[in-house]
Amino acid sequence: MALGTWGASPDEVSASLPGDELCPDARLVATRSITISAPARDVFPWIRQMGFGRAGWYSYDWIDNLGRKSARSIIPEWQNVEVGDAIPGGPIDFEAAIVDAPNVFVMRLGGTGRLSRRIRFVLAYVLRETDEGTRLVTRVRARVDLPLGGMIERLFLGPGDGIMLRKQLITLKTRAERF
C-alpha cells in the first residue's frame, strides 16, 4: 500500500524502531517519513503537545479535532508529557509509552477496558538529525482482535491512518520550518 510507506526509504521500512516491541504481533505495520529543515529540538515540541483538546493532530481538523484548528505555535503548558501520561484522542485516549526528547515519542492506545485489550495501536515518532535538518520517521503498528479484525485493519484503519498521517507529517514540516 503506497500510503503505508509514504516518504519512507526501504531502509526505514525494514529498520527496527522504538515501540515495535509494544505490538509485536501487529498485522498492520506502516512506516512513513518526511525530511524537515529544522533541528530535532525544534520539531519535537510540536509532537509532544499533540492531542484532542490540546494542540490537535495537525491533520484534517474537521475529522480528528471536531473542527478546532491545530496549534500554530508551541504551547509551553503542553510540553510536560512524560511516560505514562494520558494523551487525549477524542473518543479514545492514548498513553505516552516512550518519551526520549528530542529523539523519540511513542504513544499507544490507552485504557483497560475489554475493547482496549482487543485493539492494539502504537504510533512511534523517531527524529534523526541529518545534514538537511531532521528526518522524521513514523511507524504505526496495530492489531484488531475482533470479528473481521483483519478486514477492519486492511480496509479502514490502514487507509484512514495513511491519509491522516500523511497530512500530519506535511503540516508538522510546515509548522517546524516556519518557526
Over which residues does each language-model region extend?
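A short, structured loop/turn motif at beta-sheet edges
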Residues: S37-R41, A97-N103, V126-R135, K173-F179
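Short, surface-exposed coil-to-beta transition loops
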Residues: V29-T31, G90-I92, R118-A124
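Short Gly/Pro-enriched turn/cap motifs at secondary-structure boundaries
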Residues: C23-D25, G84-I87, L115-R117
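Short beta-strand segments that buttress and anchor functional surface loops
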Residues: V81-G84, V106-R114
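Secreted/surface-exposed cysteine- and glycine-rich disulfide frameworks
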Residues: L66-I92, V99
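Beta-strand/loop substructures that line and gate deep hydrophobic ligand-binding cavities in soluble
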Residues: V13, T112-T174
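Hydrophobic ligand-binding cavity/cleft-lining segments
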Residues: M1-W78, E177-R178
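Generic secondary-structure microfeatures
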Residues: A40, I47-G51, G67, I98-N103, ...
